[in-house]
Amino acid sequence: MLRVAVPNKGSLSESAAEILSEAGYRRRTDSRDLTVLDPANQVEFFFLRPKDIAIYVGSGELDLGITGRDLAGDSGAPVSERLSLGFGRSSFRYAAPAGKDWAVEDLSGLRIATSYPNLVRKDLTDRGLDATVIRLDGAVEISIQLGVADAIADVVGSGRTLRQHNLVAFGESLCDSEGVLIERTGAPQDDPARNQLIERVRGIVFAQQNLMIDYDCPRTILDDAIKMTPGMESPTLSPLADPDWVAVRAMVPIKGHNQVMDALAELGAKAILASNIRSVRAF
C-alpha cells in the first residue's frame, strides 16, 4: 500500500487536502486524525508537520509527500520533486532594518536569524560570505529588535510583517517556494498506486491552470481563430446547421484567456464561452 505524507496544519494543509480530494482520495473528517486509510485507492495518508515530511520521505519510510519547496530544501533530505502544485507560493529573502541601502555582501560578519538555517548557510557559502546563522523556530522578525540578530532570512509574502517591524527585504530570492509533491531520490518508479496518484494530481494541477473555450466561428476566419486557440493536439470542430459556420472547442491557459476571448470577438467569432475544467488525463 502506498504511504503518503500530507501537511497536518498551516498554509499548505487545506490546499493539499483539496487537491487530493479532487483527485478522488479520501479526506480526513477530524483534524486530530493522524492517518487516513483509503483502501479503494491502495493509499494510506499520514498527517505530519510540514517541515518533517521531507525527512520521512527521504528516509524511505513514506513513499510520497506534499510539502513546501523551501522546507524540503532546508531539510537536507535526499528527496526529488515530482510535481509543482501551484499553491502556497512565496519567496525566501534576506531582510534587515530599513534606512540603509542593503546588499547581500553587507551580511558578512553579521548575525542572521532564520527558521531555514541550511538554506541560508548554503547561500552564504555559495557567495563566499562568513556570517553567523542563528536558528529560530518562528517570529524571526522580532529577533533584531531583541538584539539576537542583525538581519533575518525568512519567507516573504506581501511584506506587511516586515514593514510592521521596520524591516526591508533585499537581494534576490534564495528560494521561490510553493507546494510540491516529493519522493525519495532514486525511489522505484513502477508502483501502480504511486503512478496513479502522480497522474491524478498532475491532472488536477493542469486543470487549475487551464480552461475550455467554446465559440461559433465563420469558416472564413477559422484559420485565424485556430491560431489563437490551438488547443492541446488541435481544437475540436463541429459542424453547425449553417454550413458556413462551425463550433470550436479548445483548451487555453487561464492566464490571458480574457484577451483571447476579446481577440476572438474582434475577429468575428460569436457565443464565446469559457468554462472550468475539473481534471485532465493523458496530456
UniProtKB/Swiss-Prot annotation:
Enzyme Commission number: 2.4.2.17
Which coarse location class describes where this protein primarily resides? cytoplasm
UniProt GO molecular function: ATP binding; ATP phosphoribosyltransferase activity; magnesium ion binding
Identify the metabolic or biological route this protein is part of: Amino-acid biosynthesis; L-histidine biosynthesis; L-histidine from 5-phospho-alpha-D-ribose 1-diphosphate: step 1/9
Tell me which UniProt keywords the record has, alphabetically.
Amino-acid biosynthesis, ATP-binding, Cytoplasm, Glycosyltransferase, Histidine biosynthesis, Magnesium, Metal-binding, Nucleotide-binding, Transferase
* Gene3D superfamilies assigned to the protein according to its UniProt record, in alphabetical order: 3.30.70.120, Periplasmic binding protein-like II
Q: What does the record give as the function of this protein? A: Catalyzes the condensation of ATP and 5-phosphoribose 1-diphosphate to form N'-(5'-phosphoribosyl)-ATP (PR-ATP). Has a crucial role in the pathway because the rate of histidine biosynthesis seems to be controlled primarily by regulation of HisG enzymatic activity.
Q: Please report the name of this protein according to its UniProt entry.
A: ATP phosphoribosyltransferase
Q: Which gene encodes it?
A: hisG
